[in-house]
């Protein structure tokens, strides 16, 4: 048997752009024959998938699923390159397969779910002719989990106490989170470094007005109140009834929000690609 050296694996990787482990496996199966290994990779569709793997996937769908007692939920983002494929039944079925497996097996690791579905992903890439990427996965546990989806583009999981008698309101709160994009439950949850960074920015902006120091201080304080309100769920105006804060609505019904997760298709992808480009 021919020794599968690092040099040989690198040569196959350079020629095919397939993953290192796939290259090594292909070479072992081909007994070190690099041309045969390439043919086998092509037959299995893995070269096609590898060649497409560098293409940006900014389209896709969000999927959510909750278990039978509504105490555990999963949310995933599955990406493709075009809106056309995102609406394709085969693509959506692939997503359903992933999230159902993640829920049933309580998988929260992105690497684990990717590894589990890599062969099916490669087959799908070959079928639709686009790069496909399981971008992220998250899970939520609690007394009661509510989910909300907006056109498969935005998904929310919400964990709350005392909400079993007000599931409709729970759905409305989840819908509010989808629309208004809060980052934290309440102001006290905002990390101090976030507050400090924003304060420096607003102070710098206000100082350019050349107004008296007292006025500048008032301007900054006002902008900071607005900033914290905009990213804190309980301090936002309720989208269904803007005359009331979300916190007021929840207090009236004695509902306590414990946690929430919000995914939107493609968010931060440009920043991620920029980071990858700088790293390469």
Swiss-Prot record:
Q: Where does this protein chiefly localize? A: cytoplasm
- Mind listing the GO molecular function terms for this protein? translation elongation factor activity
Q: Which SUPFAM superfamilies match?
A: Elongation factor Ts (EF-Ts), dimerisation domain, UBA-like
Region described as Involved in Mg(2+) ion dislocation from EF-Tu: 82-85
Keywords from UniProt, A to Z, are: Cytoplasm, Elongation factor, Protein biosynthesis
Supply one GO CC term from the record.
Answer: cytoplasm
Q: Where in the cell is it found?
A: Cytoplasm
Family, as annotated: Belongs to the EF-Ts family.
For this entry, the protein name equals Elongation factor Ts
Organism from which the protein derives:
Baumannia cicadellinicola subsp. Homalodisca coagulata
Q: What is the lineage of its organism?
A: Bacteria, Pseudomonadati, Pseudomonadota, Gammaproteobacteria, Candidatus Palibaumannia
Q: Which gene encodes it?
A: tsf
């Amino acid at each position: 048997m021919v020794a599968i050296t690092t040099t040989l694996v690198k040569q196959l990787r350079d020629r095919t752009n397939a993953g290192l482990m796939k290259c090594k496996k292909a070479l072992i199966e081909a007994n070190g024959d690099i041309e045969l290994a390439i043919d086998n990779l092509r037959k299995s569709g893995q070269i096609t998938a590898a060649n497409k793997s560098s293409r940006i996937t900014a389209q896709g769908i969000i999927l959510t699923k909750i278990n039978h007692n509504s105490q555990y939920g999963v949310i995933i983002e599955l990406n493709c390159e075009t809106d056309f494929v995102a609406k394709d039944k085969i693509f959506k079925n692939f997503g359903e397969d992933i999230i159902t497996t993640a829920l049933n097996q309580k998988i929260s690791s992105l690497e684990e779910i990717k590894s589990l579905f890599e062969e099916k992903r490669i087959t799908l890439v070959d079928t639709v002719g686009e790069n496909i990427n399981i971008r992220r996965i998250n899970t939520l546990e609690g007394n009661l989990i509510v989910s909300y989806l907006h056109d498969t583009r935005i998904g929310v999981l919400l964990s709350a106490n005392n909400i079993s008698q007000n599931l409709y309101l729970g759905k409305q709160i989840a819908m509010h989170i989808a629309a208004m994009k809060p980052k934290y439950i309440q102001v006290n949850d905002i990390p101090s470094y976030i507050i400090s960074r924003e304060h420096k920015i607003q102070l710098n902006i206000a100082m350019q007005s050349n107004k008296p120091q007292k006025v500048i201080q008032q301007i900054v304080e006002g902008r900071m109140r607005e900033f914290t309100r905009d990213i804190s769920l309980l301090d936002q105006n309720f989208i269904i009834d803007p005359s009331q804060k979300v916190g007021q609505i929840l207090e009236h019904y004695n509902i306590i929000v414990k946690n929430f997760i919000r995914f939107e298709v493609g968010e931060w992808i440009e920043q991620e690609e920029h980071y990858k480009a700088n790293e390469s």
